[in-house]
């Protein structure tokens, strides 16, 4: 996928719907170029075209983690930097399968005696490259998020006790304090980990604020900290 198409995908993910005219103005290209990009993206299963624009094609509600990892990188880096204040030597950590939490790995690598647990295959591979000891929970492989979910994964995390868990979900409503997601399987895993974690930290990029998804994970008061981009620890 070309960089311009990644930009279009980012806008689709943030807005859900885009027009050819708006994309042409935003990206400084012709409408013909935008239409060609949208046609290629539709073939790839990323969007559904309509007259004058396109909508995000539901893929369990979200783009693959391999694509999300490179979206909003500055916000992800900012959140990871701020979240690193909670790290200490000798901790047992859990990282969920979100792309944002993956940005914590360079900070985790600086600490000694860390034991890392995750349901993310991508996190496992990145941790191995950074020489961070890592345990991958078992379960059913969910390709889009490169993670393990389902009853086996739930049984695995139910027996775990961790010092600190890091999460990112699809939505955080600042007014109500509700933290939610569209994916029931991921929400189930996170609920079990949250229950057994001594501390928990949530990280949210700016575009996830003020939203609510179908499945409630918890509320703000259930977390040790909720970090939002360009805001203070809450």
What are these regions (language model features)?
Residues 98-99, 170:
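Active-site metal-binding loops of divalent metal-dependent hydrolases
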Residues 72, 93, 116, 146, ...:
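Glycine- and other small-residue-rich loops at beta-strand/loop junctions that grip anionic moieties
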Residues 95-96, 118, 228:
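Short beta-strand scaffold positions
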Residues 10, 17-21, 124-234:
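Conserved phosphate- and dinucleotide-binding cores of soluble alpha/beta proteins
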Residues 2-21, 25-26, 32-97, 105-113, ...:
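HTH-adjacent hinge/linker in prokaryotic transcriptional regulators
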